[in-house]
Amino acid sequence: MRSLESFAALLAASSAAAGLSAIATEIGFPPHTVRLDPDLQSTLGLPNAVRSARLASGRGALRAILVECEHDTPLRTVATTIAQHCAAHASQLLWLLIATQYNGCDLTIATWSADRSKPRVVALHVDRTHIVPSDAETLAALAATAAESDILAHSAWLDTLGRDALSRKFYRNLQLVVANLAASATLGTTRATATERSDLALLYISRLLFLSFIQTKGWLDYDRRFLHNTFARCMERGGNYHRRTLLPLFFGTLNTPPRARASAARAFGRIPFLNGGLFARTTLERRYPQLRFPDHTLGAVFGELLSKYRFSPREESANWSEAAIDPEMLGKAFESLMEAKG
């Protein structure tokens, strides 16, 4: 039985046809594949930028298309186009698409249901240079369907690559991380209620999760791992991430126009000014000015949330859904937390 580390390595190594075949084999397809001729490629909607296209036949109606595209080919567009053509010309088959960019970074594993005029694609879309644990968990869940019948396997693919399974896992982890962060808070000589501690923990986590979306666009000093790198550097220098990094980042940088920033704030690099109120001190924070969260529980926020899941600013649409945390899913998770608190 493979470990999550080996599933992660499999995703990272899938830069060419052999790597795609290895993934398909893990999911239950035989290793033998056949090359798709140009006419069939056209029928299935494969773009001209395809370097290699092969077909694997699984149990019953299961089929996998393994596509190696040029390095700059947008795989989301490839997936939706192929899904539409397969639904139009071969709707009796149950499809899985595994596509990669030759010498590029993107990898997509997608499936769809053909029971509608325009199929809805559900997908795992990853950056092979930065595989996160939830990516490996998704591939492991797909591999667990290898012994299922064709209809049950396809149904499991739809569930695994859809948002619901990921949303449930994320919500459970979010609940646990908020509770642990709240319990670890120190407030000097002032005592806070359990509700206040929870509200403060939720506030800090909401800020960090918001920044996780911002950094995926490279808006935090052009560094898509800005938060993780600042945490690592702070630990190397003795720790105290809350006081030495989060406080000046939140209250001297993100909530301050660039021209008004002090030298310590400018040291973070090119950071946008966010004037929406999220990075303004709340009444509760002013009530507890000595609030501190220790490094070990902030580290757990990274380990159980920020580093574990893939964050995507792209929200789900009627015809596309990714196995990633998007703003809509995050909003629903916070709503559920607030309802649970009563």
State the predicted function of each range.
Residues 2-15, 26, 39-43, 49-53, ...:
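Preference for the N-terminal adenyl/adenosyl cofactor-binding alpha/beta module
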Residues 53-81:
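Active-site ExK catalytic segment of metal-dependent nucleases
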Residues 85-89:
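Short, charge-rich binding segments
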Residues 90-94:
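Short glycine-/polar-rich loops that comprise or flank the Walker A/P-loop
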